[in-house]
């Protein structure tokens, strides 16, 4: 069996103007508004704060969120949340902002040692003890779908590892998805976001089926990531189709309808992977991001080297889907066709290769780095990348086929350069 966890979403141009009344309906009177220093200078935050104040809600802005957040960022946000005596939270920004807000809500409501709630094996993976304060997420990007999920991802600095906190309690009470918020995004951020959407959707579509998982010893212990299931399949296939139809134009010459379609695709993919879960590309991405040396991406404002999440995922994806293609041929074929691959005369068993080739073509067309080499890694880094990634048991076990350590190293070798 599988269960369905569905987020509450409002979608459409101008929906951010309704934030104040939505916050009031959730009982908010004094809220913490989480954002970052880039979004703090943009119209989206002004609209959000004006709407809150118009509804008579007191708000205090926290704009210290780090891009690609760290445990340091989560802890700082949690201190702010604990000291402010807030009765609700609003996040205005991308996945980094929403994830930091989720974690700050958790630790301010239920203080604990930091690693207590963090995923095993790094942390103790303790469940949230009870309900959190209401949280309205207002994304200004469309890749992470953090407004749809109970997941908060961060870099653990001491271990140079990316990990996260997973709990249904973290899922925001409401997401306000306003495509007008996307107009100021840099083209490379749009590209990385779109490939992240694709990866969420395709990994969920090709994940180990829910029918192949052992039932939990108690219904309350059924994980959020249940594997591919009919509910997620519908959302994920549509999300892949929308990315395939809109990605190239959205990067080079976007119209409003392209941005609206991609934000909707991000929402669908978030609903899909929020129930099915991701697998190898995301499992491998954490090491790619966490061990970054000196890569400085075009379009991101950061004072340190980083591999943005969407890029850290997609540089592995062509190699992975070529590898997993034989595990569920029809699903890979469907994904390739939805992304725009030429499938006439091809057979189902070609699905993995067709999908891989189409991804490489679209990566080149949108300026995505050429594999691991393109984000600053050398072949002498592959062993360390493998070691860090193979520990991501939650994601690795969700793959459609077993993966040995040597096979994972082979995937990193195949991801080194594509053209």
Task: Set out the residue ranges of the language-model regions.
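ATP/NTP phosphate-donor binding region
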Residues: 1-88, 372
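Generic secondary-structure signature for well-ordered alpha-helical cores
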Residues: 24, 53-57, 82-83, 106-109, ...
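Short Gly/Thr/Asp-enriched flexible loops that form oxyanion-binding sites at enzyme active sites
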Residues: 47-48, 76-78, 97-111, 148
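Glycine/serine-rich anion-binding loops at beta->alpha junctions
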Residues: 86-104, 140-147, 279
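A glycine/threonine-rich phosphate-anchoring loop and its flanking beta-alpha core
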Residues: 110-224, 327, 334
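Active-site segments that bind and position negatively charged phosphate/pyrophosphate groups
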Residues: 211-352, 357
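C-terminal charged capping/lid subdomain of soluble metabolic enzymes
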Residues: 332-419
């Amino acid at each position: 069996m599988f269960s369905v966890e569905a987020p509450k979403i409002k979608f459409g141009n101008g929906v951010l103007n309704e934030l104040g009344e939505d916050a009031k309906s959730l009982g908010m009177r004094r809220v913490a508004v989480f954002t970052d220093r880039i979004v703090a200078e943009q119209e989206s935050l002004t609209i959000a704060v004006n709407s809150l104040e118009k509804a008579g809600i007191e708000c205090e802005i926290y704009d210290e969120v780090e891009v690609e957040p760290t445990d340091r960022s989560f802890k700082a946000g949690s201190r702010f949340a604990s000291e402010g005596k807030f009765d609700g939270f609003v996040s205005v920004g991308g996945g980094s902002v929403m994830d930091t807000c989720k974690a700050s809500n958790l630790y301010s409501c239920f203080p604990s040692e930091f690693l207590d709630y963090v995923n095993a094996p790094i942390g103790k993976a303790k469940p949230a003890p009870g309900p959190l304060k209401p949280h309205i997420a207002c994304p200004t990007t469309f890749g992470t779908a953090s407004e749809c999920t109970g997941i908060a991802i961060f870099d653990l600095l001491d271990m140079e590892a990316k990990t996260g906190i997973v709990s249904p309690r973290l899922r925001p009470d409401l997401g306000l998805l306003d495509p007008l918020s996307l107009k100021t995004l840099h083209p490379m951020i749009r590209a990385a976001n779109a490939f992240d959407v694709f990866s969420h959707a395709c990994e969920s579509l090709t994940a180990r089926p829910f029918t192949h998982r052992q039932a939990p010893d108690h219904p309350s212990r059924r994980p959020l990531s249940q594997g591919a299931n009919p509910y997620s399949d519908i959302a994920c296939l549509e999300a892949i189709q929308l990315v395939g139809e809109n990605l190239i134009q959205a990067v080079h010459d976007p119209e409003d309808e392209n941005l609206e379609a991609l934000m909707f695709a991000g929402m669908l993919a978030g609903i899909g992977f929020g129930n099915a879960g991701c697998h190898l590309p995301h499992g491998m991405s954490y090491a790619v991001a966490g061990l970054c040396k000196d890569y400085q991406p075009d379009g991101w404002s950061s004072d340190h080297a980083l591999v943005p999440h969407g890029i850290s995922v997609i540089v592995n994806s062509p190699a992975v889907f070529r590898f997993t293609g034989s595990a569920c041929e029809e699903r890979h074929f469907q994904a390739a066709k939805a992304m725009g691959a030429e499938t006439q005369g091809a057979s189902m068993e070609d699905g993995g290769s067709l999908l891989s080739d189409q991804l490489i073509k679209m990566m080149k067309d949108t300026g995505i780095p050429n594999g691991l080499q393109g984000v600053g890694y050398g072949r002498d880094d592959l062993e360390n990348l493998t070691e860090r990634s193979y520990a991501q048991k939650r994601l690795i076990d969700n793959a459609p086929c077993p993966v040995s350590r040597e096979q994972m190293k082979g995937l990193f070798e195949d991801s080194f350069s594509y053209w």
